[in-house]
């Protein structure tokens, strides 16, 4: 008689979890992450101090940053880190909420599976619930920004930064973010407005206060002049971007020269100086009056450039020079020697104005009038940790506004969408005759985790507030002329029409968050067995 071989028989020294044990193990690992980040959610959420192995400190309430700084060993929990990172790359905002919804869905689904419901039924129910949510958001919850007026854009940015460190200077940063998007606005072949946010450069300058941050229409980079005797402003500059240093030429170490007369050593030094002067002369003869290099400029080359009235900027980042070269209509030059070996420079970049300004204790290069639409946001703040968090906050706000402008569709914030979807799904579940109706009920319950955590982090009674919100929305939905956009104002603890009070966010962000959270939950709930090999077998 053939004996059935189990996973435990195959593994020697490894671990195996199957069935309900596997689901519960994954759910427990997820809850640890959930509890770690839920207090950072919302306008009144708290910050986390993350210290890495090198002792570097970062203070943030950004979900993706917190998760990336956590040491997570559990493979299932690592999916949440990937989820938040992907949300940050694709959407830019909502990294915390997408993880909270995903974990809530996994927890509810795990309980259903433990009670005897088959995982396929839970997965099918979640898919049905998600599809209904998307349809409901499109048909009933969304409004066009064209109908709401220009104030809607400011409201979107204010809602995004309300939970960020820059919320205390929301007037300043709303203006900066909106103007930055207008600077880079372009039209594609379908006559649709596009906002390539990669053309927005964000610089950090320690010192000063947050309200000293400003927008520059053009490109800015943190670099300094090679000499204080060089001009700090050039109109109609001819720009040369080079990827080599302007330093005294020296023969490579692999070259050996044998001399029988000590006086010839001086001839070798003179020849090296002549080669260096010839290179600088080639640059000057090209007509360039601004030279940007990724390397250094030594004293001799600096003297020659100053005498020729050429501005030299040293130690620029190569990525910055690639952007500047493209925006000025040239390319990054890696060598001034052409194919024949002669020194020559073929092309220069052009702009309207080149300027070096002092910001705090550092210098900043500003270039205006580029061939390509570009914008730079220069941030000021007390210390590097604050500036890092400001950069993340501005990036999130820029991404949110881009989504709003490109989709022209917004939904109310403050838990209004989640509560409305929960009520809709509860009604929808009663129309489903199959087993999936149980999973749809649990999906509806999971969505309520967002308004509950919002109110808890604001120091309010979450159960009472969410119950009042659900009853208010239910009454308004029953009344066809009533408002279905009721949400929570966490600062006052009141229930209000969040569209009317300007608490809004892009509808595409909400739908992408739901999609990502649902897909992550389904991928975890479908896991029937966890096999952990011992370290020596894993290496083999």
Swiss-Prot record:
Keywords annotated in UniProt: ATP-binding, Chaperone, Cytoplasm, Nucleotide-binding
Taxonomic placement: Eukaryota, Fungi, Fungi incertae sedis, Microsporidia, Unikaryonidae
A Pfam family the protein falls into: Cpn60_TCP1
Subcellular compartments: Cytoplasm
Protein name: T-complex protein 1 subunit alpha
InterPro entries reported in the protein's UniProt record: Chap_CCT_alpha, Chaperone_TCP-1, Chaperonin_TCP-1_CS, Cpn60/GroEL/TCP-1, GroEL-like_apical_dom_sf, GROEL-like_equatorial_sf, TCP-1-like_intermed_sf, TCP-1_chaperonin
Subunit organization: Component of the T-complex protein 1 (TCP1) complex.
Gene Ontology molecular functions: ATP binding; ATP hydrolysis activity; ATP-dependent protein folding chaperone; unfolded protein binding
Purpose: Molecular chaperone; assists the folding of proteins upon ATP hydrolysis.
Family label: Belongs to the TCP-1 chaperonin family.
Any one annotated GO CC term: chaperonin-containing T-complex
Annotated source species: Encephalitozoon cuniculi (strain GB-M1) (Microsporidian parasite)
């Amino acid at each position: 008689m053939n004996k059935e071989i189990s996973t435990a028989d195959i593994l020697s020294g490894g671990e195996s979890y199957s069935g309900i044990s596997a689901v519960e193990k994954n759910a427990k690992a997820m809850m640890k992450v959930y509890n770690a980040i839920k207090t950072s959610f919302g306008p009144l959420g708290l910050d986390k101090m993350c210290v890495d192995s090198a002792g570097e400190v970062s203070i943030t309430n950004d979900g993706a940053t917190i998760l990336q700084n956590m040491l997570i060993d559990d493979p299932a929990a690592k999916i949440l880190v990937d989820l938040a990172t992907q949300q940050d790359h694709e959407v830019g905002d909502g990294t915390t909420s997408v993880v909270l919804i995903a974990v809530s869905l996994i927890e509810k689904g795990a309980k259903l599976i433990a009670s005897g419901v088959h995982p396929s039924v839970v997965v099918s129910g979640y898919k049905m619930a998600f599809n209904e949510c998307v349809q409901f958001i499109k048909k009933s919850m969304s409004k066009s920004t064209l109908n709401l007026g220009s104030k809607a854009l400011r409201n979107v940015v204010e809602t995004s930064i309300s939970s960020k460190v820059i919320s205390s200077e929301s007037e300043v940063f709303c203006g900066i973010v909106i103007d930055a998007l207008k600077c880079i606005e372009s039209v594609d072949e379908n006559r649709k407005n596009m906002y390539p946010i990669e053309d927005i450069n964000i610089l950090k300058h320690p010192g000063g206060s947050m309200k000293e941050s400003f927008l520059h229409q053009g490109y800015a980079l943190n670099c300094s002049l090679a000499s204080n005797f060089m001009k700090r402003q050039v109109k109609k500059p001819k720009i040369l971007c080079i990827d080599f240093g302007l330093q005294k030429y020296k023969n490579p170490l692999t070259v050996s020269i044998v001399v029988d007369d000590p006086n010839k050593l001086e001839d070798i030094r003179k020849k090296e100086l002549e080669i260096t002067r010839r290179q600088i002369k080639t640059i000057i003869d090209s007509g360039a009056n601004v030279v940007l290099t990724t390397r250094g400029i030594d004293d001799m080359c600096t003297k020659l450039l100053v005498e020729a009235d050429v501005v030299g900027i040293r130690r620029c980042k190569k990525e910055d020079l690639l952007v500047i070269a493209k925006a000025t209509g040239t390319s990054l030059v890696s060598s001034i020697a052409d194919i024949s070996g002669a020194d020559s420079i073929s092309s220069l970049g052009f702009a309207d104005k080149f300027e070096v300004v002092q910001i705090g204790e550092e210098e900043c290069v500003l270039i205006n009038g580029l061939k390509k639409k570009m914008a730079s946001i220069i941030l000021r703040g007390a210390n590097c940790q604050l500036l890092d968090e400001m950069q993340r906050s501005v990036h999130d706000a820029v991404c949110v506004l881009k989504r709003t402008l490109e989709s022209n569709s917004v939904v109310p914030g403050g838990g209004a969408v989640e509560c409305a979807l929960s009520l809709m799904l509860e009604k929808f579940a009663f129309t489903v005759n199959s087993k999936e109706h149980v999973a749809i009920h649990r999906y509806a319950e999971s969505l309520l985790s967002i308004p509950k955590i919002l109110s808890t982090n604001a120091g309010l009674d979450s159960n009472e507030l969410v119950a009042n919100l659900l009853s208010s929305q239910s009454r308004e939905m029953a009344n066809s002329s009533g408002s279905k956009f009721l949400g929570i104002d966490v600062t006052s603890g009141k229930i209000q029409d969040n569209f009317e009070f300007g608490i809004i966010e892009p509808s595409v962000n909400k739908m992408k968050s739901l999609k990502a959270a649902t897909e992550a939950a389904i991928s975890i709930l479908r896991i029937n067995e966890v096999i952990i090999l011992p370290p020596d077998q894993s290496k083999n």
